[in-house]
Curated annotation (Swiss-Prot):
Pfam families reported for this sequence: PCC
Compositionally biased region (Basic residues): 123-133
Free-text comment on this protein's domains from its UniProt entry: The PPC domain mediates interactions between AHL proteins.
An annotated GO cellular component: nucleus
DNA-binding region boundaries: 86-98
Top-rank taxon: Eukaryota
Function: Transcription factor that specifically binds AT-rich DNA sequences related to the nuclear matrix attachment regions (MARs). Acts redundantly with AHL4 to regulate the formation of tissue boundary between the xylem and procambium in the root meristem.
UniProt-recorded name of the protein: AT-hook motif nuclear-localized protein 3
Comp. bias (Pro residues): 35-51
Subunit composition and interactions: Homodimer. Interacts with AHL4.
CDD domains for the chain: DUF296
Transmembrane segments: none
Gene Ontology terms, MF aspect: minor groove of adenine-thymine-rich DNA binding
Length: 404
């Protein structure tokens, strides 16, 4: 039993790496076996010297007590390297092939405690427009209106177009106030004329003038939305009294979508905040506007047109005749002879060769007396064709004959 156990221990010796080696005992007769020893699964790079049976048993027992757990190493394969070298296109996958979520690297947090290691080049400054900017050389198109006439107007920071004398304003009408009275009060603060551009907001009561009946009005009560509001008020000075002349027209929409409107003839109460856009201008300044426009053209370098209207009547007449001179088109030199005939179809089939030479010979022009002349000429042409056929040895055959 001891020898058998010693043999088993000698045959299966465990190394310090947890790997087993197998050895076969030599033949008792001292000869060599023909079969080679089996190749171990995991060959140990460290060779174990042969020992005696008691020493081998002692080593095996010590190694078995202090043996470490076996481990395995996973080496990268060629497929993995090929996949890494292969460039993937398109959007990266959100899930792995096994269904697990792909873990992506979180971006570096942006905070003051984390210093930036990468240095970015300074941003290049773009080329400026330079001193040759035409817009800077010219005067500004918009400027604040600081004329003494408009100091009383309730418009803060209003823009005045150069040469237009038009200033926009925004009026806010609170709930329960009359929009018409608000606009009239604003127009009486200055000497300028006003025009209503637009408005929006809810209306609770409105009185409209009916165009069908003279002097008739109609009042609507409810909640309506302003679609449009237009009108103007001009200042009139007559007999030392200053008054305003003008009117407004409105278009409203009801809660059911019905649209109606007309000229305002009474109350125009706001059901909520109403915003009104008005513009003020100086009326009767047509001549000054023309002068300002001329000055602006000269300032901007616009040259006036070179059209001159100081020309004499004779020169104007000569230009007209030169433009409206008639062009004489010469008549064509080719002339066609027309032959009167009463049987155009017969002449077309019997005189095919002559028809090719003169396409107008078979067109009837009119008159009944020319039939005999056409028949005689047709017979002469037939005689000429027969003579040509006999000369060239051909058989003459009429166009209206059916070949057998």
């Amino acid at each position: 039993m001891e020898e058998r156990e010693g043999t088993n221990i000698n045959n299966n010796i465990t190394s310090s790496f947890g790997l087993k080696q197998q050895h076969e005992a030599a033949a008792s007769d001292g000869g060599y076996s023909m079969d080679p020893p089996p190749r171990p699964e995991n060959p140990n790079p460290f060779l174990v010297p042969p020992t005696t049976v008691p020493a081998a048993a002692t080593v095996a027992a010590a190694v078995t007590e202090n043996a470490a757990t076996p481990f395995s190493l996973t080496m990268p394969t060629e497929n993995t390297s090929a996949e890494q070298l292969k460039k993937k296109r398109g959007r990266p996958r959100k899930y792995n092939p096994d269904g697990t979520l792909v873990v992506t690297l979180s971006p570096m947090p942006i905070s003051s405690s984390v210093p930036l290691t990468s240095e970015f080049p300074p941003r290049k400054r773009g080329r400026g427009r330079g001193k040759s900017n035409r817009w800077l050389k010219k005067s500004q198109m918009f400027q604040f209106d600081r004329s003494p006439v408009d100091t009383n107007l309730a418009g803060v920071g209003t823009a005045d177009f150069v040469g237009a004398n038009f200033t926009p304003h925004v009026l806010i009408v609170n709930a329960g106030e009359d929009v018409t009275m608000k606009i009239m009060t604003f127009s009486q603060q200055g000497s300028r004329a006003i025009c209503i551009l637009s408005a929006n907001g809810p209306i609770s009561n409105v009185t409209l003038r009916q165009s069908m009946t003279s002097g008739g009005t109609l009042t609507y009560e409810g909640r309506f939305e302003i679609l449009s509001l237009t009108g103007s008020f001009m200042q009139n000075d007559s007999g030392g009294t200053r008054s305003r002349a003008g009117g407004m027209s409105v278009c409203l929409a009801g809660p059911d979508g019905r649209v109606f409107g007309g000229g305002l003839a009474g109350l125009f109460l706001a059901a909520g905040p109403v915003q009104v856009m008005v513009g003020t201008f100086i009326a009767g300044q047509e001549q000054s506007q023309l002068e300002l426009a001329k000055e602006r053209r000269l300032r901007f370098g616009a040259q006036p047109s070179s059209i001159s209207f100081n020309i004499s009547a004779e020169e104007r007449k000569a230009r007209f005749e030169r433009l409206n001179k008639s062009v004489a088109i010469p008549a064509p030199t080719t002339s066609y002879t027309h032959v009167n005939t009463t049987n155009a179809v017969h002449s077309y089939y019997t005189n095919s060769v002559n028809h090719v030479k003169d396409p107008f010979s078979s067109i009837p022009v009119g008159g009944g007396g020319g039939g005999e002349v056409g028949e005689e000429e047709g017979e002469e042409d037939d005689d000429e064709l027969e003579g040509e056929d006999e000369e060239f040895g051909g058989d003459s055959q009429s166009d209206n004959e059916i070949p057998s």
